Amino acid sequence: MFTGIIEEVGKIAQIHKQGEFAVVTINATKVLQDVHLGDTIAVNGVCLTVTSFSSNQFTADVMSETLKRTSLGELKSNSPVNLERAMAANGRFGGHIVSGHIDGTGEIAEITPAHNSTWYRIKTSPKLMRYIIEKGSITIDGISLTVVDTDDESFRVSIIPHTIKETNLGSKKIGSIVNLENDIVGKYIEQFLLKKPADEPKSNLSLDFLKQAGF
């Protein structure tokens, strides 16, 4: 599990595609301080398993489904990537629950500088938009962010200068593709309501109840 608080911006050293999957090597330092083979590191929000490492880089396999569902297949040498180690049991929970399992991608439609922040509008599919709500959590390239507002096909987030400095968002442009992970809580609630057995005793839990409770 991750929290969406980026620890380091690494750089792609090499990405080697082998048929339907790829092997990616990433230059990094901080996330390698206590790494072990088999550990997981989120790369632009994608949970990858470390298959080899040295003092300044690590390698991971990227499966075909991951290449299809995420933007990792578009990365090139020297592309900056957001990195976060899996959360330790005694770590601080600084963002929100992030699984590292990407739901899909979005496209940056607008970048609007403001006085003390920068507004990003992200356009994505209706399949993802159904889980994106005003003031809810969203993970963009592994970064835990709060949704400011939405419309039928896009949503906006406001990024403070510190986040732009400490992540790869400063390198993004209009048209850039980003990985999106919806808040896992909403997905579980939907499945709970849809798959409730017919013979189960009636519960007071409903969408209206959750809305009234502030969810």
UniProtKB/Swiss-Prot annotation:
Reaction(s) this enzyme catalyzes, per UniProt: 2 6,7-dimethyl-8-(1-D-ribityl)lumazine + H(+) = 5-amino-6-(D-ribitylamino)uracil + riboflavin
Q: Cite a single GO BP annotation.
A: riboflavin biosynthetic process
Listed binding positions for 2,4-dihydroxypteridine 1 are 4-6, 144-146, 158-163
Alphabetically ordered keywords of this record: Repeat, Riboflavin biosynthesis, Transferase
- Pathway membership: Cofactor biosynthesis; riboflavin biosynthesis; riboflavin from 2-hydroxy-3-oxobutyl phosphate and 5-amino-6-(D-ribitylamino)uracil: step 2/2
EC primary class: transferase
| Gene Ontology molecular function, alphabetical | riboflavin synthase activity
Positions that bind 2,4-dihydroxypteridine 2: 47-49, 61-66, 100-102, 135
Q: Which InterPro entries match?
A: ATP_synth_asu-like_sf (IPR023366), Lumazine-bd (IPR001783), Lumazine-bd_dom (IPR026017), Riboflavin_synthase-like_b-brl (IPR017938)
**EC number(s) reported in the record:** 2.5.1.9
**Subunit and interaction comment:** Homotrimer.
Q: Which NCBIfam families match?
A: PRK09289.1, PRK13020.1, ribE
Q: What does this protein do?
A: Catalyzes the dismutation of two molecules of 6,7-dimethyl-8-ribityllumazine, resulting in the formation of riboflavin and 5-amino-6-(D-ribitylamino)uracil.
Question: What is the recorded name of this protein?
Answer: Riboflavin synthase
Give the gene symbol. Answer: ribE
